[in-house]
Amino acid sequence: MKFVLLFGVLLVTLFSYSSAEMFDDFDQADEDELLSLIEKEEARAKECTPRFYDCSHDRHSCCRSELFKDVCTCFYPEGGDNEVCTCQQPKHLKYMEKAAGKAKKFGGKVKKWFG
């Protein structure tokens, strides 16, 4: 009976050790993948097109604002036949950013009151 109990404890210990090693390997792979994605995003962010600049060469190159990415909007100017594309922020996203900023500011005040 003691042998079975000792063997069971040894088996559980080895199983937990092997699964912990496996999870560490997965965590390391996830971290490496995340770091490479962050590096790619930073490299791409340096090449973005600022707001109200021409984005007709690459419609997905608009810069990010505080919360949202600007959108390449194309239109025909009055009296013109050429299409013009510029990076712009849609109004609903502009209002959402303002509301988030005010909520953040109010949250800071509440934290001061009760913190």
Curated annotation (Swiss-Prot):
Disulfide bonds: C48-C63, C55-C72, C62-C87, C74-C85
Organism encoding this protein: Lycosa singoriensis
Domain notes: The presence of a 'disulfide through disulfide knot' structurally defines this protein as a knottin.
Pfam families (UniProt xref): Toxin_35
Subcellular location field: Secreted
Alphabetized GO MF terms: toxin activity
Signal peptide: 1-20
Protein name (record): U3-lycotoxin-Ls1q
